[in-house]
Each structure stands twice: as C-alpha cells, then as structure tokens.
Amino acid sequence: MNKKLNRRIFIEKSAMAAAAAGILSASACSTNDKKDLAGLFIHHVYFWLKDPSNQEARTRFEKAARELVTIETIIDSHIGVPAPTSRDVIDTTYTYSILSTYKNKEDQDIYQTHPKHLKFIEDCQDLWDKVLVYDSVSI
C-alpha cells in the first residue's frame, strides 16, 4: 500500500510540475517579440521588369539586389516578390520589391550615393520598365 501511495504522490507531483512548465513555456512564447520600427527611415522600392519571364534577367537582378542590401547603413532588408494574395486593394503587378530600413534620413542619403547602389542601377536599369519608391518615417 505504501508503494501505491508513493507512486500516486509522485505521479501527482510530476503532473503538477509538467503543467507548471507548460504554463511557463506558454507565457514565454506569448511575449511580444515584434521589432519596433519607430524612428527608422523605411525605403521600399518596387520594380517592374521588362520581361519578368526571362530567367536570366531575374537571376541577374536577384544577384545584384543581394549585393545591394549589403550596404553598411542598411539595418534590415527584404527582397521579395508579390505574395499569392488576391484582394481588390492589392497590387501584384510588380516583379520585385526591395525594402530597406535605416537609422535616419542621413544614412539613407549615404545609401543613395553609395558605389554599390550606383552599380546596382548601372547593371540593372536595362532590366526594368518601371520603378516606384515609397519612403516613410514614423508618425
């Protein structure tokens, strides 16, 4: 009987410990890990390639874009293509977008005249029909 009682107590304590660990784990996962973009300068560029079905052109653009976002003043970057979403307010006509964030306008100004940025334009401008830029700062 003593063995059964000890086993039962062990199981109950183990269950409580597991439940407590689960609660702690769940609360740790629910913390807000969102990156705060407040105060940053956001530069978002959309490109429409002349021939988006040309794989050689796409490869050339992607390689150049990956080099472009290595500029030192860029805090974070994202090179993307239209997401597979369909709503009336979404424009999916562009071929690529490049999003980059900067500490301030001065760092973005450095980017604008940086040799890697100028090389990107020189090497790829023959690939696109249209470029549209949206810059924004926090409210």
Predicted features along the sequence, with ranges:
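N-terminal secretory signal peptides and thylakoid transit peptides that target proteins
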Residues: 1-18
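C-terminal segment of N-terminal export signals and the immediately downstream linker at the start
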Residues: 26-56
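Short, glycine- and small/hydrophobic-rich beta-strand elements in well-ordered beta-sheets
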Residues: 28-33, 66-95, 132-138
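Short, well-ordered beta-strand segments in beta-rich or mixed alpha/beta enzyme
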Residues: 40-49, 80, 87-112
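Short amphipathic alpha-helical segments
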Residues: 53-79, 115-125
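Surface-exposed, polar helix/loop patches in the mature regions of secreted/periplasmic/lumenal proteins
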Residues: 100-138
